[in-house]
Each structure stands twice: as structure tokens, then as C-alpha cells.
């Protein structure tokens, strides 16, 4: 079942044609090593290559992928940050057929030696992943937004995280079959074309109240009795800065980063970690890598051993990434 889920993700979410797995002698689940995209019978434009790379970088499923065309086979580092000024992300050294055969053979992936080779040590790094880059960028946005708005840091943080969640829902919904939230919700209730339009028209707090009611939870809530001071400060503050960050209208190197992210492919576990990461004053990123979380969940909740009655407690819960991953496993069961 773990292979089936991996294949489904590769095909439906990323459009990959094949997946190469690494198998283990013990009871560990097979791990996807790379995705393969077959373009031997169809044209591949530069725009399509950039789209594939953007999605792969955001998705954090495998560190390397291959694109096969009629006259070439190219290997790509899925951890390399997208750059819209570049046409191709394939390493030049890899284009040389003989060297490619030596460095990118199946056996090196089967035994894991590929990742330990000297030539590969500067590539496929978590430090360059969308996960770390997003959190790093959001820390800069949070600091700037708090300074410009003058809001209390906890109010500014809560507002930013709520806006991030809404943006996440909006962009994921754009690719769904219904598309209700992205195309209808804002227009129906606030006569706005999208989330950033809601912010610019000064209706953010009204939207949060509506979402708090519709979602039947406290994640979007600003209590009208207990948080009067906070609500007043939000009403009086120039919140449009948030819209500029979210749609990347600030044309400098610091904030256009938002355009790099595809929330249809960014793992939900990343979003779950944002609040805790922004809460700390440290410049370091302490986000737990998804591969570690997956390993622990596989050990505690094997996919091939579904349970009808299962209880789980995370006694040192921080970002909630383990609980999110565990919930996804229960859904898979």
C-alpha cells in the first residue's frame, strides 16, 4: 500500500510518469528516490520545465527527478530554489552521457551511495528546500509587518498565520474540482475577487469572523468579548501591507519570494509548523524534516497494519507536524 500511495501522489499531484523506489531488507517501507517525466512523445517547453521544477521544489517528495526527451535525458536537483530567469535546472556535468551513466546508475540509488558521493554533497540539500525557504522568508515578512503596522507582536503573528492559512486554502482550492472557496466564497460574502482584495478593502476582520463561524473552530477567531483591544487595534491599523506580501507586489528581493510557492504541492505539515517557528526570536530554523517524521510514523503506524482503534499522544508537541502526519496515516488506513 505504501507504494500505491507514493505512485498516486507522483501521478496525480506532480504528473510524473514513473517512480524509482529504494527497497530495504528489513521491514521498512520502500522509499521513493526519484520521479521520472516522459516527454519522448510530446513537446516540452521552457515554461513547462519551470513549472515542473517549481512543483517539485515545493512538494518535497524526492530530492531528484529525471526528464526524458527524444534526444536527451536530464537529471534535476529538486531542492534547488526556482529562478525564473533560468531556462534549465539540469547540471551541465550531467548532460555528458558517459559521466551521467557512471554517477546516476540504479545501483547507487538502491544502496544509498548516491547521496554520499562527493560530487553530490553540495546538491539535494534540505537547506535549499521550499520548507526552509518559506519559513525563513516568513520570518522576514513577520518582522517587517509588525514594524510597519505597529501591532503587538502576538497580534501581528496571529494575524499573519491566519492570513497564511487562508491563502493556503485559496490557492489549493484553485486546483480542486469544486473551486468554491477560491472562486465563489469571497465574491458571495464580501463582493471581492480574492483574499488579497478582501484585505485591501478593509474587510479582513469581517472575513475572519465569518470563517470562524463557518469552520466551527477557534483557528480564525478574534473573540468579540475577550479580545476587544486586539480587534480595535486591527481595525485601526493599515493592514494592506499583508496583501502586498501575500500577492508579492513589493518589488524587491525580500518579498517576491511568495511567487515561488505552489500551495497545491507544498506539504500541509509545513503550514502546521509556521506558528511555532515564527514565535521564536531565533534566526535558525528548527523545523523537523519530513523524512524524520515519516520514519517515526512508519515505525509506530505501519501502513500495512491498519488499526480500527488507535490512540496517539505527542508528549512534546511543538509545531504539530507529527500529529498532522499521523492523522494523514489514519486517513490512509
Which residues fall in each region the model found?
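Amphipathic alpha-helical scaffolding segments
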Residues: 80-93, 159-162, 177-195, 209-212, ...
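Short N-terminal helix-initiation segments at or just after the protein's N-terminus
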Residues: 2-11, 99-111, 262-263
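Extended, well-ordered alpha-helical scaffold/bundle regions in very large, multi-domain proteins
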Residues: 174-220, 313-326
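Class I S-adenosyl-L-methionine
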Residues: 118-171, 175-177, 227-333
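Nucleic acid-processing catalytic cores of prokaryotic defense/repair systems
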Residues: 1-96
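Alpha-helix capping and helix-coil boundary motifs
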Residues: 42-49, 100, 148-156, 181, ...
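Long amphipathic alpha-helical segments that form oligomerization/scaffold cores
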Residues: 204-205, 209-243
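Extended, non-transmembrane interaction/recognition domains
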Residues: 76-125, 166
Amino acid at each position: 500500500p505504501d507504494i500505491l500511495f507514493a505512485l498516486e501522489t507522483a501521478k496525480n499531484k506532480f504528473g510524473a510518469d514513473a517512480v524509482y523506489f529504494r527497497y530495504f531488507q528489513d521491514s521498512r517501507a520502500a522509499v521513493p528516490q526519484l520521479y521520472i517525466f516522459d516527454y519522448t512523445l510530446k513537446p516540452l517547453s521552457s515554461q513547462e520545465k519551470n513549472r515542473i521544477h517549481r512543483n517539485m521544489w515545493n512538494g518535497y517528495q524526492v530530492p531528484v527527478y529525471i526528464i526524458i526527451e527524444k534526444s536527451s535525458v536530464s537529471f534535476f536537483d529538486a531542492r534547488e530554489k526556482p529562478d525564473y530567469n533560468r531556462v534549465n535546472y539540469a547540471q551541465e556535468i550531467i548532460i555528458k552521457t558517459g559521466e551521467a551513466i557512471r554517477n546516476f546508475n540504479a545501483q547507487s540509488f538502491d544502496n544509498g551511495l548516491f547521496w554520499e558521493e562527493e560530487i553530490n554533497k553540495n546538491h539535494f540539500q534540505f537547506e535549499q528546500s521550499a520548507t526552509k525557504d518559506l519559513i525563513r522568508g516568513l520570518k522576514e515578512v513577520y518582522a517587517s509587518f509588525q514594524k510597519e503596522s505597529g501591532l503587538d507582536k502576538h497580534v501581528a503573528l496571529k494575524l499573519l498565520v491566519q492570513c497564511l492559512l487562508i491563502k493556503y486554502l485559496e490557492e489549493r482550492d484553485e486546483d480542486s474540482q469544486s473551486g468554491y472557496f477560491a472562486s465563489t466564497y469571497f465574491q458571495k460574502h464580501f463582493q471581492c475577487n480574492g483574499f488579497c482584495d478582501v484585505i485591501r478593502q478593509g474587510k479582513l476582520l469581517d472575513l475572519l469572523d465569518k470563517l470562524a463561524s463557518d469552520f466551527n473552530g477557534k483557528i480564525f477567531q478574534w473573540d468579540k468579548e475577550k479580545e476587544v483591544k486586539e480587534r480595535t487595534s486591527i481595525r485601526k491599523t493599515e493592514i494592506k501591507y499583508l496583501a502586498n506580501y501575500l500577492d508579492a507586489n513589493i518589488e524587491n528581493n525580500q518579498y517576491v519570494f511568495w511567487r515561488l510557492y505552489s500551495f497545491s504541492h507544498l506539504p500541509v505539515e509545513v503550514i502546521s509548523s509556521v506558528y511555532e517557528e515564527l514565535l521564536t526570536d531565533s534566526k535558525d530554523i528548527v523545523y523537523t524534516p519530513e523524512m524524520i517524521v515519516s520514519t517515526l510514523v512508519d515505525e509506530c503506524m505501519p501502513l500495512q497494519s491498519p488499526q480500527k482503534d488507535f490512540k496517539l499522544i505527542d508528549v512534546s508537541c511543538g509545531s504539530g507536524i507529527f500529529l498532522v502526519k499521523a492523522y494523514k496515516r489514519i486517513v490512509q488506513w
